[in-house]
Regions:
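Short coil turns linking two alpha-helices in DNA-binding domains
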Residues: 37-40
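A short alpha-helical element within helix-turn-helix/winged-helix DNA-binding domains
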Residues: 28-35
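Beta-hairpin "wing" of winged helix-turn-helix
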Residues: 52-67
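Alpha-helical residues within the helix-turn-helix
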Residues: 32, 49-50
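C-terminal regulatory/oligomerization modules of transcriptional regulators
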Residues: 95-161
């Protein structure tokens, strides 16, 4: 299970939109803010539109904006919109196939880890991120954002062009 750079950039773009839900943000501005090529930002936008997370408005004053409340978008939804289903191992994929299926002692381990990851990312919304709410902690040392001051904020802003 790997959270891709593309997903990281998507989350940063969405945080910019969530900071100001009325904001209409151009893909070009989003690309500049997260420091990615415009074409890459467009492909991210496409996945988010397809998932119903953002809407895209064309034209000179066009751009993208959140289609739903930030509190209604889970981190798992974003991950899966950008990179597809979250799977721990090929055997746990929706169409997973393994020659040892049914006889492998590791399948329950991978399936359990996958379920924990999905449930955890379903428990955190985009709204939680931008509002700096405390995340549910798997381990108490990760519950306190102040333990990670360099990651305390998204440093996101919607700028007018």
């Amino acid at each position: 299970m790997d959270i891709s750079r593309k997903t990281d950039y998507a989350l940063r773009m969405l945080a910019m939109l969530a900071e100001d839900p009325e904001c209409l943000l151009s893909v070009r501005t989003a690309a500049e803010e997260v420091n990615v090529p415009y074409s890459f930002a467009r492909s991210i936008q496409h996945g988010l539109v397809q998932a119903g997370i953002v809407e895209s408005l064309r034209g000179v004053h066009g751009g993208m904006r959140l289609k739903v409340s930030p509190d209604d978008v889970t981190i798992r939804q974003v991950v899966e919109a950008v990179q597809g289903p979250m799977v721990m191992n090929d055997c746990t994929a929706p169409d997973g196939d393994c020659a040892r299926m049914g006889a492998c002692c590791y399948h329950p381990l991978w399936a359990g880890a996958q379920a924990l990851m999905r449930d955890y990312l379903d428990s955190v919304s985009l709204g939680d991120i931008v509002a700096h709410r405390q995340f549910p902690a798997v381990d108490p040392k990760f519950a306190n954002r102040e333990a990670f001051p360099e990651y305390a904020t998204c440093a996101c802003a919607c700028r007018e062009e």
